[in-house]
């Protein structure tokens, strides 16, 4: 009764769209958005109940409208350095339709911005991250050292923070780390030693596109006709200039098998975004088996 009344009060408090999410880690698949994943207050309450069977609390908050971007920063406790921004596409199907996933693909541009943003928004994200790093030290007395991967959204009222992860993004790391010209060991050492401010991190001026090859049943509800199509054998042909990053796969005596999650990250790197996309799309087409991907 208590949870029902509390959730009901929050749901009726929102005049416009809102979202419901887990108060915890769910691999990027726990958020449901009004208008996309549910439409009525009854459906919203049903999802709240489901969340509360797995977690002690549920998040109900305003839905923000805008373009999202990922900014993976490195921090030595005092200095925060941003890597080129990336846009991740979490929805399972073309045109950003269907359920959220851990990420079906991502891209970055050769100018180290994105088509809908400038360096101004990158700087705003970096400033927010710097303030968070300072707040961590102020509140805990400890210097945070490592990756601060922020999810941001550009709204009509400016750049807003959605979340932080203390790790690289998946798939966003596959867009950025191949472009890093500075020795990554030197970067890690500078983070440990607190000397990141002395290191000039350099990235190639290249565009990247990452597309995930996934089982046909990946991310689908149990009642979907393809939901049971998960683990299966796959064969990989000539991928040309693309890079492959193996994820949820199992090498057996008779070949390579997908498991139930994202199988292979296929990355194209080129001077332009369109060429990088062409490389990735051509390569993912030679992965044979019951696989799916986002051709867009």
Task: List where the protein language model places each region.
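Internal nucleotide-binding/catalytic subdomain
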Residues: 30-173
